[in-house]
């Protein structure tokens, strides 16, 4: 299947120049539909004319930047997938290996709040991935021990 990068580029320009009077207010633990675009390789693509995909807000850094994890309707038995059932009783998965930073301009609409237990489990999974690769000390290391 040929990817329409030109169409995504036009949508990306529209998103970048949008100055909505009513900005969304995403909160951690909530699933939102976002314009994530056409990606390269095995990264999760958006669908529809606006290249949308549901994502979970993992961390809010400020009113404009967020860490999100994309959702998939396909559950898989990999350690970087977090499989669960959404509020509509559909099996879905968070693809934690595809954690990414996105701008507020990509957020379209709120879907639902992830349960406390699922959110805590996903955060523990992400933390586990980060702890597997210990920071090196020495040149370039400026943070306190255990800063991550």
Which residues make up each language-model segment?
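Residue-level recognition of conserved beta-strand positions in structured domain cores
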Residues: 36, 70-71, 98
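Short hydrophobic-aromatic micro-motifs
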Residues: 33-34, 57
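C-terminal terminal-subdomain/extension
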Residues: 1-11, 83-148
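Loop/turn positions that initiate beta-strands
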Residues: 28-31
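Compact nucleic-acid interaction/catalytic patches
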Residues: 44-88
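Extracellular/periplasmic catalytic domains that process cell-envelope and extracellular macromolecules
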Residues: 25-26, 88
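Short, charged beta-turn/beta-strand-edge "cap" motif at the junction between a beta-strand
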Residues: 37-42
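Short alpha-helix capping/helix-loop boundary micro-motifs
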Residues: 15-22
């Amino acid at each position: 299947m040929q990817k329409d990068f030109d169409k995504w580029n036009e949508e990306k320009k529209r998103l970048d120049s949008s100055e909505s009077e009513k900005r969304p207010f995403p909160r951690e633990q909530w699933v939102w539909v976002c314009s994530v675009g056409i990606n390269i390789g095995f990264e999760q693509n958006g669908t529809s004319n606006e290249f949308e995909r549901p994502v979970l807000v993992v961390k809010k850094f400020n009113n404009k930047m967020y860490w999100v994890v994309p959702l998939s309707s396909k559950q898989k038995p990999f350690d970087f997938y977090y499989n669960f059932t959404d509020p509509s009783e559909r099996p879905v998965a968070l693809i934690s290996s595809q954690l990414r930073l996105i701008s507020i301009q990509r957020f379209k609409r709120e879907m639902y709040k992830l349960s406390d237990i699922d959110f805590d489990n996903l955060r523990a999974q992400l933390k586990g991935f980060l702890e597997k690769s210990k920071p090196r000390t020495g040149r370039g290391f400026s943070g306190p021990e255990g800063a991550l």
